[in-house]
């Protein structure tokens, strides 16, 4: 069986809808926290987009802004400045209830922690987001989501009866059940061994190649990043480099090493990527 097909979802009444081939567009994002001597700029004018049906890895050292970028892009946090557009809808135009509905219906989340309910079966965990929203998912949709991650035969198993890799694949199926426009994955292999990591990364790659899913993944691992179509490198809240085409773990690691050896050059390249200031 194939993964659940994406469902067209009307935009909330009164919001601005823009037709685009990019599933996610970030424009001039700044995220500033604290005041005075405690003021921290987590994102500093980030503008980028994530095309439909592509797999992007976001990398950078601790404090580079990669998790903040993902949280702002996914509507989990609000930027200080700038706009976020997902599937044609500007998040800045949404009220709290509308934003909650958009996250629930059009965004899938996969985190390092599996966050499965231990007393529920795999199938029950997958359908939980819809049940919490007062909807009863058709059994065939739950089966299709589990089949897409290769776990249709484990539907009745509880998390304690599944390996770590299987639990993360259940989490991916849970992210797919709403037929999202984009799946955001934050260090999805961080708690897994190398074999289980490969399973999850191949799964994410397959969702893009076989079903046209858009995936944005934060990772610190060049091997994980090599599964992506595109790698964004962040430092000090800015996009300082980008890799596309023929991405390998060695190429990613080498680019990171060059950037760390020449931070001034990285800053100049970041300014080039950002384009002329307004």
Show where each model-derived region lies.
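Short coil-to-helix segment of the ABC ATPase nucleotide-binding domain corresponding to the Q-loop/switch region
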Residues: 120-128
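ABC ATPase NBD coupling module
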Residues: 35-40, 91-108, 132, 249-253
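Conserved ABC transporter NBD signature motif
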Residues: 82-93
């Amino acid at each position: 069986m194939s993964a659940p097909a994406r469902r067209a979802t009307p935009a909330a009444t009164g919001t601005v809808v823009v037709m685009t081939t990019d599933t996610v567009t970030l424009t001039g994002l700044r995220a500033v926290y604290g005041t005075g001597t405690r003021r921290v700029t987590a994102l500093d004018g980030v503008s980028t987009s994530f095309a439909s049906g592509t797999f992007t890895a976001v990398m950078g050292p601790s404090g580079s802004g990669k998790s903040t970028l993902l949280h702002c892009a996914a509507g989990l946090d609000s930027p200080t400045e700038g706009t976020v557009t997902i599937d044609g809808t500007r998040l800045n135009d949404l009220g709290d209830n509308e934003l909650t509905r958009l996250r629930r219906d059009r965004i899938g989340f996969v985190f390092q922690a599996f966050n499965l309910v231990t007393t529920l079966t795999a199938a029950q965990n997958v359908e939980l987001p819809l049940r919490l929203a007062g909807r009863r998912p058709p059994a065939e949709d739950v089966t299709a989501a589990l089949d897409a991650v290769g776990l249709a035969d484990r539907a009745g198993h509880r998390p304690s009866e599944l390996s770590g890799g299987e639990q993360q694949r259940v989490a991916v199926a849970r992210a797919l059940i709403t037929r999202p426009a984009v799946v955001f994955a934050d260090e999805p292999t961080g708690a897994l061994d190398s074999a289980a990591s490969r399973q999850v990364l191949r799964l994410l790659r397959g969702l893009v190649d076989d079903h046209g899913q858009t995936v944005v993944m934060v990772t610190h691992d060049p091997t994980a990043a090599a599964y992506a179509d595109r790698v964004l490198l962040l430092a000090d809240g800015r996009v300082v480099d980008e890799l596309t085409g023929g991405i390998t773990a060695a190429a990613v690691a080498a680019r990171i090493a060059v950037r760390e050896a020449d931070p001034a050059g990285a800053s100049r390249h970041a300014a080039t990527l950002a384009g002329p200031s307004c």
